[in-house]
């Protein structure tokens, strides 16, 4: 028997925080008929963007992430704010975090960050021929260093653990599947 959606019998928001809310659902399993509790992190969707310069460099950001207590190498990204489209949010995050702008972005698709406990999506984009047009405009909780990394070095940076953020890896995976089919992140080129 194929799995089916569970019937939600109750749902209530437990707490709200700046970037997410915690919700508790009670739902009935269609297979067993038993009721179970589920805890959901409700969040607005996220975006990230792979910005490429005309000379083949990826505009990346190095920043501190309090959850892991580490400084990570990532691509620009952030929240889709109310009234924004994912595309608009990606372009905004690019300019705010790096000072680079893009005239147009191309969708690389979206993923569900963790559908077991989260209700949001992460939309990834590609921007080509980005240009530095202004200074960064970081908020007071950000401390971002802009890093220009040659696109040719990205697979090795993934292999050696320099790039570890799962949503950044998903964006690069989509990019390499669509735009660089001869490049492998496993160490050998495909022919």
Question: What residue spans do the PLM features occupy?
Answer:
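A short, amphipathic edge element
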Residues: 1-12
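Short glycine/serine/proline-enriched coil/turn segments at secondary-structure junctions
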Residues: 17, 67, 115-117
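Acidic, metal-coordinating catalytic segment for phosphate/diphosphate chemistry
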Residues: 11-48, 54
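A glycine-rich, hydrophobic loop/mini-helix early in the fold
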Residues: 43-74
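Unchanged
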Residues: 36, 45-48, 53, 79-166, ...
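Long, compositionally biased
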Residues: 180-191
């Amino acid at each position: 028997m194929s799995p089916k959606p569970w019937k939600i019998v109750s749902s209530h928001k437990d707490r709200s925080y700046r970037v997410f809310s915690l919700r508790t659902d009670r739902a009935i399993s269609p297979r067993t008929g038993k009721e179970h509790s589920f805890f959901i992190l409700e969040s607005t969707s996220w975006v990230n963007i792979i910005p490429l310069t005309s000379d083949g460099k990826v505009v990346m950001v190095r920043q501190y992430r309090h959850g892991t207590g580490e400084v990570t190498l990532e691509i620009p990204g952030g929240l889709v704010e109310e009234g924004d489209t994912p595309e608009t949010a990606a372009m905004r995050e690019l300019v705010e975090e790096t000072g680079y702008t893009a005239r147009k972005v191309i969708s690389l698709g979206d993923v569900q960050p963790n559908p077991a406990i989260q209700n949001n999506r992460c939309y990834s984009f590609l921007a080509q021929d980005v240009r530095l047009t202004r200074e960064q405009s970081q908020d007071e909780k950000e401390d971002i260093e802009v890093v220009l990394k040659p696109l040719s070095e990205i697979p090795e940076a993934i292999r050696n653990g320099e790039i570890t953020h799962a949503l950044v890896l998903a964006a690069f995976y989509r990019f390499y599947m669509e735009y660089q089919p001869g490049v492998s992140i496993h160490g050998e080129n495909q022919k």
